[in-house]
């Protein structure tokens, strides 16, 4: 018999390493951006009104990014504190031997979090937390605004990178963009030049990854699926596009993308889920 989930510790140090690396990378990006803006070529030349709009956009993006990240990390998607005992067990319920508890449909046990997650989608290793029923909305919005912030940073750093690349050959440009570490180790670039190329490379790659993740999870959102259900071709909870959006994002699903603190309560509880039959989408 394993220990009940309430008595077990949280994920160990190895599982936290991606979170540490994510935080360190974010710090490097901020330092490089500050260095280029203050001591380097500075931001692209703009008119005062355009500059004010750019600053407003940056502040808006940053607020959305940090707001959704905070909501994601503060939301507990697990069965901790959820009254499961005494509920009428129906189809889809199962017994988790690790948690020593009955768990509802669409739940899954996470070996990193060491607890079952309500409507578990996957474990986000970069943030060290599972994506489930209660934090799916901020996770999706986080992908959107992370892609926007990373692209904005790439644009702000592009004049400095362009000035560096114009002074060298095409082969040097390709090598610096694709193999900045090798260029640094062989002494072809300075540490400052390497940092600039590395940050721009990772920001562009990060934006592409966030964009791809947003497209993938947007598809799942419209289909009413989790990643686990998608991998197994299950469509048991597909209520149609409109119902699926409201089930995951609340009644204000079209507005939650623009402001992280907008009230849009979820219609469910993460324990019971409607099926197409319940909403009259299946006829005999």
Curated annotation (Swiss-Prot):
Enzyme Commission code: 2.3.1.225
Location in or out of the cell: Membrane
Transmembrane segments: 19-39, 53-73, 138-158, 167-187, 196-216
Residue ranges of domain DHHC in the record: 94-144
Xref: PANTHER family: PALMITOYLTRANSFERASE ZDHHC24-RELATED (PTHR22883:SF414), ZINC FINGER DHHC DOMAIN CONTAINING PROTEIN (PTHR22883)
Gene Ontology molecular functions: protein-cysteine S-palmitoyltransferase activity
Domain-level remarks: The DHHC domain is required for palmitoyltransferase activity.
Reactions accelerated catalytically: L-cysteinyl-[protein] + hexadecanoyl-CoA = S-hexadecanoyl-L-cysteinyl-[protein] + CoA
Keywords attached to this entry: Acyltransferase, Lipoprotein, Membrane, Palmitate, Transferase, Transmembrane, Transmembrane helix
Keyword Transferase: yes
Chief location of this protein within or outside the cell: membrane
Catalytic residue positions: 124
Gene Ontology process terms (BP): protein targeting to membrane
Function field: Probable palmitoyltransferase that could catalyze the addition of palmitate onto various protein substrates.
Family: Belongs to the DHHC palmitoyltransferase family.
Membrane topology qualifier: Multi-pass membrane protein
Cytoplasmic domain ranges by topology: 1-18, 74-137, 188-195
A GO term from the CC aspect: membrane
Official protein name in the record: Probable palmitoyltransferase ZDHHC24
Extracellular topological domain residue ranges: 40-52, 159-166, 217-284
């Amino acid at each position: 018999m394993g220990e009940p989930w309430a008595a077990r510790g949280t994920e160990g140090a190895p599982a936290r390493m991606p979170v540490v690396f994510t935080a360190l990378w974010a710090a490097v990006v901020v330092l490089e951006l500050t260095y280029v803006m203050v001591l380097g070529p500075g931001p692209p030349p703009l008119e005062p009104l355009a500059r004010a709009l750019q600053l407003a956009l940056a502040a808006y993006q940053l607020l959305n990014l940090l707001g959704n990240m905070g909501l994601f990390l503060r939301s507990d998607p697990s069965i901790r504190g959820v009254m499961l005992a005494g509920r009428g067990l129906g189809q889809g319920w199962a017994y988790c031997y690790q948690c020593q508890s009955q768990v509802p449909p669409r739940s899954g046990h996470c070996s990193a979090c060491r607890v079952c997650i309500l409507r578990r989608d996957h474990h986000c290793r970069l943030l060290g937390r599972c994506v489930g029923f209660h934090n799916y909305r901020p996770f999706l919005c986080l992908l959107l605004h992370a892609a926007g912030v990373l692209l904005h940073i790439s644009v702000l750093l592009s004049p400095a990178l362009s000035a560096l690349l114009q002074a060298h050959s095409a082969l040097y440009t390709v090598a610096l963009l694709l193999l900045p570490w090798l260029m640094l180790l062989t002494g072809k670039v300075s540490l400052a030049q390497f940092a600039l190329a590395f940050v721009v490379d990772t920001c562009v790659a990060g934006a592409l990854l966030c964009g791809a993740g947003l497209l993938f999870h947007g598809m799942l959102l419209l289909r009413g699926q989790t990643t686990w259900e998608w991998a197994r071709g299950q469509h048991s909870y597909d209520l149609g596009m409109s119902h699926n959006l409201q089930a995951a994002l609340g009644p204000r699903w079209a507005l939650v993308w623009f402001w992280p603190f907008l009230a849009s309560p979820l219609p469910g509880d993460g324990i019971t889920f409607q099926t197409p039959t319940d909403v009259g989408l299946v006829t005999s």
